[in-house]
């Protein structure tokens, strides 16, 4: 078999190779027990085989067999590898089949670097398809390549090896010896000149095998070393295969590749191979590589003897000295090829066997699945039938019962209709009889109409009985009698429309007449009898045609036809014949189709009846089948029905008894509640009386020492002081001589028994509590500066002002104060000092502009000067007034060091280092005395402020803490301070609750438990302000007595004679057309009933009403708040120039001629080059002068020479003598284009036209003979317009021009607009000559000067050089027709229309013109910042100088803006938002205040107008308030007047004024907003609905009443002014003056105690609601 003993020895040594664990390649699969398994190579034992084939020393790395499971693409030729189950697509390869005729291939295709493809697709070790137990590779790893192969097959899907690994492994491969002669293959000659002669794939049979050499370190070479017959030749120096010789000495880095179950790229984490085997000593023993666990189960062949150790050692030593392996000998390649072919064949056999087994297993599996699924299907079908068979049977029975019921209904309906027909026929007969017996014609007509009506109803009922409704198409046909046999009558006559006798009421039909109770009962009895007969199984009575009815109908119709007036006409007359022909035509055109339709309807009805009869007959035929079960079913049904009726009866009886018992219990409970309510009312009345008495006594004791009434009555005006009431108000109880017992027992409020105690005991308890409260306040004030138990006597104790308590004289002005206080201000200082003595807090509520700031500063100066109390003082003010406080303190008291506590968090941290918390006493040299900060920052840093002990805390604009639910109010209440002073010009803004919040803040111990007290006063006083009812004078007097000791208020007119009263004017404006349209649309979208429901409901719908109010207010302000008029321009079909940065373009960017049309006309380059056009001369154009020489001269009839000759010969150009033109001029005109001729004509003077102005008589006209043909020039009327430049003659000569200008046609808007605009089509040619020619044409100086004239610089040069006037080129471009749009079609919004679109803005425009002429300066207040944006555009349009301040203005910008307005008299208007610009700023340089839209809180407007009406104002202040009449603004203004009445009544003590208030209740905000949106009638409906709802809720049982959840939402103030009035350093909103609900500590907040579930979907923040109202969302 083998031709060489070396090959036999190689085969015989195969078993030894397997025994020694040589690294042979195996397949990843094996066959064992006829079940192929595709798994990892290391999981299965090797396949047993009697004679394993010889294998080479090196292996080829192939992908695993699992890749055969992947789908293959059949679009190209496919090669299947049976040893690896891997398919590879080839471009130029044969079918992968084993063919012994092909040249043999060896597995060692990658032994040498020159034989390996440039990029091998296999990066995994080759494995045998038979015995795959482990993956290994030879110690000498084949080199890897980094280049792609250039063979005829595609690259594999495996990842290539990195170049570093490839170069590192190339040095391990040695070339064969130089003198080694191998057998040439079939294609060695063809591969000698190829750079990469071998393909990498295993089964490519078109290539010869490469020369292989044995690995000297493989076990096959070791075992065969002792039996080699021929010694190898002497080793020659190896030839270098690499260009880089440095790689030859580098040891190779072999890689073990992890075997994957699928064909995937080789992993990157490869374990390094042992490289020490190549550098072993000559006689060192070689340790075999440890095989895998699968190799341990390999059976060692028993016929092979055990090797001798000595021989092995000798062989190893011989191999190490040898330079080539056993495969380098002669004949080895041939044996290697035979071994490879046998391996391939064996692999194919294994695969074919596996394929057959796989098919059998698949068939068996599918058969088993089919049987199992069939069994499941049968079982499911059987189960479904068992489960749903009863339901199906019941459904069929229910359908039959329903059909039976429907049939019964049809029968009843049929009987009712037949009865109706009979009744109508009887009525008709009766009416006809009465008509025959009628005495007068009117009564006869009435009865005939009744007869016709009955006949129509009978006809309609008959048609309904037949199954079709009466059609309008057959109304003019005489109604027929009931034809019970079907079909229609053969005789008919045309008649008038029966429906024209009278107009129908409404859109409803006549319908059938109402039946009486007797008729309905009779029909019910008849139907019950029929049903009983059906239930018994009796046969129904047959329904026979009613012959009498049909005959009666015929008789009646005949009688009706005889009623008509007989008109006898001769049959021979033409009128009769014409009438007869017309009737025949009408019958053929109208009546015949109608009769056909009637016939068709009758036929369909008859067929339907027959079909129903057949169905009934079929059902009767099946009746005998159901008689067996019907009686039993009917009995059960009747029994069940009887049981149900009995149960319903007893349930109804029990329910009635239960309801009656509940009603009795409810009545008893209501009676008990009434008794308890009366007792509780009496108890509450005594309780409130006790609280008032206690507070009056406290106020009486404090008022004696503070002398508030005396100071408040004091004034600079003697008349006012004299007119004041002389006697002081007396308290509600007798306190004369009551000094009280200081040691009396104090009774807690909870321990009082208001039911049993008498009035004397309660009065005594009230007096004791009042004295105790006074003593407690004084003790707390004395002990404030002695927290550590210091002694009162001592020289250093200067902070206890007890010595001031008995001082009677007024204190003088402090010397530290660098100003002179007015008399009322000095009295205010004395009042504040007295409060400080008693340890009582107070409210300084002087009107805005009376110097509350300087009075507060004077108190601090007085304490520092008189008692050496230098602080610490805390001043808390709105962010807008912080700079003002700092400047005022530094100006009036320079000795007080002020810390401006604002800025970033880091800055505030530095400022807090100056605070001295260890020492109580502050001296003149302390680092600070006064801290000035804002409300927001104080609340934010409350933890630091609470650690300080403040001597005096002043709160400016104290209405910021008017809500007792806000976190601001709660935080400030916890500050440690000896005294608190509240400064506010408006102590009451909306209701009495706000006043009591301030009182509780200054005296927590006294006003702590006065919720009922506050509710009492609030209800009575506010109801008086709204309903104009009589106020309880005793309550009002007692309230004023309570407030007197704690609040001091003076008004300007009482204390300042030089400051005149401000004039307030309401300016009413009308809605414009556009505003009315918007307003009407909004009103139409509101459902009044929906609005009524929202108004009387709870407060959940308040957000919707808020949005509606905002929308209406925006309409009143300006319609552009909804939609702005945009700039319009036509669609531009062009592209514009673009630049990445304007900084690179320089200061002047030239944008002329930068637009490009999207349409480009490409011109061939040949035309643009030299010689492309014949008329353009050039070096490549030899025929350039052809056109000029021949066409322009020889062939041109307009040449001067030709025209001169023809003119002399009286030929074609003889007319030149009458045209006043020479031959040269005519030739020039002929050669010029249209533009040049127009320029020539426009620049030449028209002398012929001037003759017409001189000789304008018809009989005396001058016509020059040489210009007879110049008709246009002679008839030109242009010279007539230049005769005169003034007077009537000019107007007569320029009628068209003057009329055009006078009628405004030059400024009117065009009636049409261009839809699109585009520059000229762009000409493109890749030639520089074309570009230059375009530039010459576009920028021709002569043409440009003629069109546009010369530039200003050129004209100046001509004037300087004194050139002739003809050198100045005039502008010949005609002026645009429309002076507004000119040459462009871009339309900007009209500012004049912008002004006239709003009634307010138009009225304001006229008002500002007058104010500007009168040298006034204006403060313009707005509610909406978007309206301020629009106003800026208006002021810019009118060229008024203005400045702006709103909520978004930063703090430093705000200070500079106010300073600029105060110092710069050229600023005419100051735009401000009401909340941002209405607090604490001085704008006395303005004398006019305009409210563009008013605030619903009148105190906000009062504060805003007092920015100008304050101390320092020397001019009369006028306040204008713009109100849109007939809109929501009038109702808002009325509500603001009600709030002003509350303030006047509470503070000034006056009675109710003559203000026209309505009788509405102010119980919830939702109702008020609903009232703003409706008129008076709708308001009355809301009041009525509310009363009904209250009554229903009162009468409802306790369990039925709906629970009203108290929901706190942002009111309209917060919503409208969100983001305004906050001047934080970071330019962020700091919270509105009224704390917005939802903040920390507010009820209903998400993080509070009650806000567990958070906000609902309807609940939105104020900012979100404002965005919705503005239309931004």
Swiss-Prot record:
Q: Which InterPro entries match?
A: DBINO, DEXQc_INO80, Helicase_ATP-bd, Helicase_C-like, INO80/SWR1_helicase, P-loop_NTPase, SNF2-like_sf, SNF2/RAD54-like_C
Q: Where is this region: Disordered?
A: 1-194, 206-248, 401-544, 654-682, 709-739, 1589-1673
Q: What is its EC number?
A: 3.6.4.-
Which family does the record claim for this protein?
Belongs to the SNF2/RAD54 helicase family.
Role summary: ATPase component of the INO80 complex which remodels chromatin by shifting nucleosomes and is involved in DNA repair.
Q: What is recorded about the domains?
A: The DBINO region is involved in binding to DNA.
Name of the protein: Chromatin-remodeling ATPase INO80
Q: Where is the composition biased (Polar residues)?
A: 17-34, 129-144, 218-227, 460-469
Task: Spell out the GO cellular component terms annotated for this protein, sorted alphabetically and separated by semicolons.
Answer: chromosome, centromeric region; chromosome, telomeric region; Ino80 complex
Q: Where is the Helicase ATP-binding domain?
A: 833-1005
One Pfam family in the UniProt entry: Helicase_C
Bias kind Basic and acidic residues: ranges: 1-12, 83-117, 185-194, 419-431, 443-458, 516-526, 535-544, 1608-1627
Which Gene3D superfamilies does this UniProt record tie to the protein? Answer: P-loop containing nucleotide triphosphate hydrolases, Tandem AAA-ATPase domain
List the gene name: INO80
Q: Where is the Helicase C-terminal domain?
A: 1403-1563
Enzyme class, top EC level, equals: hydrolase
Q: Where is the composition biased (Low complexity)?
A: 1631-1643
């Amino acid at each position: 078999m083998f031709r060489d003993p070396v090959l036999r020895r190689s085969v015989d040594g195969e078993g030894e190779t397997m025994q020694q664990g040589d690294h042979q390649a195996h397949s990843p699969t094996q066959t064992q027990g006829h079940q192929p398994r595709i798994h990892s190579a290391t999981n299965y034992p090797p396949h047993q085989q009697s004679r394993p084939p010889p294998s080479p020393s090196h292996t080829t790395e192939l992908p695993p067999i699992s890749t055969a499971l992947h789908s293959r693409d059949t679009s190209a030729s496919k090669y299947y590898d049976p040893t690896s189950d891997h398919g590879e697509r080839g471009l130029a390869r044969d079918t992968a089949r084993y063919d012994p005729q092909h040249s043999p291939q060896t597995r060692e295709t990658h032994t040498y670097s020159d034989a390996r493809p440039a990029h091998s697709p296999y990066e995994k070790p080759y494995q045998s398809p038979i015995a795959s137990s482990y993956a290994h590779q030879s110690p000498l790893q084949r080199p890897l390549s980094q280049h792609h192969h250039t063979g005829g097959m595609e690259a594999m899907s495996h990842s290539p090896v990195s170049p570093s690994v490839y170069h590192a492994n190339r040095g391990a491969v040695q070339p064969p010896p130089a003198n080694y002669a191998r057998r040439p293959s079939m294609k060695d000659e063809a591969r000698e000149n190829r750079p990469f002669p071998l393909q990498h794939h295993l089964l490519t049979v078109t290539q010869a095998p490469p020369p292989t050499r044995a690995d000297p370190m493989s076990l096959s070479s070791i075992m065969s070393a002792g039996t080699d017959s021929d010694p190898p030749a002497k080793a020659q120096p190896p030839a270098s295969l690499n260009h880089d010789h440095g790689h030859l000495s580098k040891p190779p880095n072999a890689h073990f590749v992890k075997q994957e179950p699928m064909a995937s790229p080789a992993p990157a984490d490869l374990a390094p191979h042992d490289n020490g085997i190549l550098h072993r000593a000559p006689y060192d023993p070689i340790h075999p590589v440890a095989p895998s666990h699968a190799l341990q189960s390999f059976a060692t062949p028993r016929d092979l003897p055990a090797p001798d150790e000595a021989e092995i050692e000798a062989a190893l030593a011989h191999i190490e000295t040898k330079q080539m392996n056993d495969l380098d000998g002669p004949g080895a390649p041939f044996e290697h090829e035979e071994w490879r072919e046998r391996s391939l064949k064996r692999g194919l056999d294994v695969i074919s066997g596996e394929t057959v087994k796989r098919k059998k297993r698949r068939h068996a599996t599918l058969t088993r699945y089919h049987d199992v699924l069939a069994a499941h299907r049968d079982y499911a079908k059987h189960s479904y039938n068992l489960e749903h068979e009863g339901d199906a049977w019941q459904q069929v029975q229910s359908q039959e019962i329903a059909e039976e019921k429907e049939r019964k209904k049809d029968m009843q309906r049929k009987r009712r209709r037949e009865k109706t027909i009979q009744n109508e026929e009887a009525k008709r007969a009766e009416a006809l009889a009465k008509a025959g017996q009628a005495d007068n014609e009117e009564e006869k007509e009435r009865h005939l109409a009744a007869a016709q009506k009955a006949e129509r109803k009978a006809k309609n009922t008959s048609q309904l009985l037949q199954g079709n409704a009466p059609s309008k198409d057959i109304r003019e046909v005489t109604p027929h009698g009931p034809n019970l046999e079907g079909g229609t009558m053969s005789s008919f006559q045309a008649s008038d429309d029966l429906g024209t006798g009278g107009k129908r009421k409404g859109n409803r039909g006549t319908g059938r007449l109402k039946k009486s109770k007797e008729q309905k009962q009779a029909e019910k009895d008849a139907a019950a009898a029929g049903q009983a007969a059906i239930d018994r199984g009796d046969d129904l009575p047959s329904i026979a045609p009613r012959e009498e009815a049909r005959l009666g109908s015929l008789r009646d119709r005949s009688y009706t036809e005889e009623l008509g007036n007989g008109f006898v006409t001769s049959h021979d007359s033409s009128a009769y014949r014409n009438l007869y022909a017309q009737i025949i035509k009408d019958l053929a055109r109208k009546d015949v189709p109608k009769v056909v339709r009637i016939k068709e309807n009758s036929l369909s009805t008859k067929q339907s009846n027959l079909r129903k009869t057949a169905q009934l007959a079929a059902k009767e035929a099946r009746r005998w089948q159901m008689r067996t079960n019907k009686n039993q079913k009917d009995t059960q049904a009747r029994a069940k029905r009887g049981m149900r009726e009995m149960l319903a009866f007893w349930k109804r009886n029990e329910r009635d008894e239960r309801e009656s018992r509940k009603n009795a219990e409810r009545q008893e409970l209501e009676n008990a509640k009434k008794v308890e309510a009366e007792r509780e009312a009496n108890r509450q009345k005594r309780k409130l009386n006790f609280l008032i008495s206690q507070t009056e006594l406290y106020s009486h004791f404090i008022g004696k020492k503070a002398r508030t009434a005396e100071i408040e009555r004091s004034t600079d005006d003697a008349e006012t002081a004299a007119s004041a009431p002389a006697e002081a108000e007396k308290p509600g109880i007798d306190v004369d001589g009551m000094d009280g017992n200081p040691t009396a027992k104090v009774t807690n409020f909870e321990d009082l028994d208001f039911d049993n105690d008498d009035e004397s005991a309660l009065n005594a308890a009230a007096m004791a509590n009042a004295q105790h409260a006074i003593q407690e306040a004084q003790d707390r004030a004395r002990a404030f500066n002695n927290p550590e138990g210091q002694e009162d006597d001592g020289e250093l104790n200067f902070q206890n002002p007890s010595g001031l308590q008995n001082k009677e004289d007024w204190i003088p002005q402090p010397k530290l104060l660098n100003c002179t206080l007015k008399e009322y201000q000095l009295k205010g200082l004395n009042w504040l000092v007295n409060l400080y003595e008693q340890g009582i807090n107070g409210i300084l509520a002087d009107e805005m502009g009376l110097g509350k700031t300087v009075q507060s500063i004077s108190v601090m100066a007085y304490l520092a000067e008189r008692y050496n109390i230098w602080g610490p003082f805390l001043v808390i003010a709105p962010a807008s007034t912080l700079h003002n406080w700092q400047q005022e303190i530094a100006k009036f008291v320079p000795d007080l060091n002020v810390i401006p506590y604002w800025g970033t968090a880091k800055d505030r941290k530095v400022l807090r280092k100056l605070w001295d918390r260890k020492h109580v006493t502050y001296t003149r040299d302390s680092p600070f005395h006064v801290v000035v900060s804002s409300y927001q920052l104080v609340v934010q840093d409350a933890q630091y402020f609470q650690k300080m002990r403040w001597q005096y805390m002043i709160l400016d604009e104290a209405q910021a803490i008017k809500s007792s639910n806000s976190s601001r109010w709660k935080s400030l209440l916890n500050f440690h301070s000896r005294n608190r002073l509240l400064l506010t010009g408006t102590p009451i803004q909306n209701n009495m609750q706000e006043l009591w919040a301030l009182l509780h803040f200054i005296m927590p111990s006294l006003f702590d438990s006065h919720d009922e007290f506050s509710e009492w006063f609030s209800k009575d006083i506010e109801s008086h302000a709204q309903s104009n009812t009589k106020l309880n004078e005793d309550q009002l007097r007692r309230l004023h007595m309570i407030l007197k000791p704690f609040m001091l208020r003076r008004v300007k007119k009482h204390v300042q004679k030089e400051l005149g009263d401000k004039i307030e004017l309401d300016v009413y404006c009308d809605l414009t057309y556009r505003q009315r349209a918007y307003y009407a649309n909004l009103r139409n979208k509101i459902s009044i009933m929906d609005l009524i429901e929202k108004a009387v409901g709870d407060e959940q719908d308040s957000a919707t009403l808020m949005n509606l109010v905002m929308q209406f207010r925006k309409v009143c302000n300006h319609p552009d708040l909804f939609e702005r008029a945009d700039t319009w321009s036509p669609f531009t079909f062009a592209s514009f120039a673009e630049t990445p940065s304007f900084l690179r373009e320089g200061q002047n960017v030239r944008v002329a001629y930068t637009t490009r049309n999207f349409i480009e006309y490409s011109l061939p380059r040949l035309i643009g080059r030299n010689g492309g056009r014949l008329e353009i001369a050039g070096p490549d154009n030899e025929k350039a002068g052809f056109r000029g020489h021949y066409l322009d001269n020889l062939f041109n009839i307009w040449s001067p020479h030709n025209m001169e000759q023809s003119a002399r010969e009286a030929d074609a150009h003889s007319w030149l003598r009458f045209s006043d033109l020479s031959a040269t001029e005519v030739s020039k005109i002929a050669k010029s284009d249209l533009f040049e001729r127009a320029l020539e004509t426009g620049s030449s003077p028209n002398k012929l036209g001037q003759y017409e102005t001189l000789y304008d008589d018809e009989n005396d006209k001058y016509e020059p003979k040489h210009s007879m043909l110049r008709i246009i020039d002679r008839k030109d009327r242009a010279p007539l317009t230049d005769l005169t430049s003034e007077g009537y003659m000019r107007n007569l000569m320029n009628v068209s021009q003057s009329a055009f200008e006078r009628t405004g046609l030059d400024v009117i808007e065009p009636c049409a607009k261009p839809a699109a605009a585009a520059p000229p089509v762009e000409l493109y040619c890749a030639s520089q000559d074309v570009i230059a020619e375009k530039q010459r044409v576009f920028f021709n100086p002569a043409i440009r000067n003629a069109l546009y004239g010369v530039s200003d610089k050129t004209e100046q040069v001509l004037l300087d050089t004194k050139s002739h006037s003809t050198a100045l080129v005039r502008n010949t471009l005609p002026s645009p027709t429309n002076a507004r749009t000119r040459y462009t079609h871009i339309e900007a919004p009209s500012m004049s229309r912008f002004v006239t679109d709003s009634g307010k803005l138009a009225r304001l425009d006229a008002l500002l013109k007058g104010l500007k002429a009168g040298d006034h300066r204006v403060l313009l207040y707005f509610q909406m910042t978007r309206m301020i944006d629009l106003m800026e555009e208006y002021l810019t349009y009118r060229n008024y100088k203005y400045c702006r301040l709103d909520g978004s203005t930063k703090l430093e910008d705000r200070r500079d803006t106010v300073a600029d307005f105060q110092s710069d008299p050229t600023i005419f208007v100051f735009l401000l938002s009401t909340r941002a610009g209405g607090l604490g700023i001085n704008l006395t340089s303005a004398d006019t205040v305009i409210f563009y839209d008013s605030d619903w809180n009148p105190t906000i407007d009062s504060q805003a107008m007092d920015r100008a009406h304050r101390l320092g104002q020397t001019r009369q202040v006028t306040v204008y308030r713009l109100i849109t009449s007939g809109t929501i603004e009038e109702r808002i203004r009325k509500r603001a007047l009600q709030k002003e009445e509350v303030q006047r009544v509470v503070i000034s003590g006056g009675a109710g004024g003559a203000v026209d208030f309505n009788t509405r209740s102010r119980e919830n905000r939702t109702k008020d907003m609903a009232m703003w949106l409706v008129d008076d009638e709708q308001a009355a409906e809301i009041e009525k609905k509310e009363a009904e709802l209250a009554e229903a809720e009162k009468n409802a049982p306790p369990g039925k009443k709906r629970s009203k959840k108290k929901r706190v939402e942002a009111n309209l103030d917060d919503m409208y002014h969100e983001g305004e009035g906050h001047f934080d350093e970071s330019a962020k909103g700091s919270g509105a003056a009224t704390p917005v609900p939802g903040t920390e500590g507010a009820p209903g907040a998400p993080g509070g105690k009650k806000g567990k579930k958070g906000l609902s979907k309807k609940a939105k923040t104020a900012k979100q609601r404002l965005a919705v109202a503005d239309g931004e969302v």
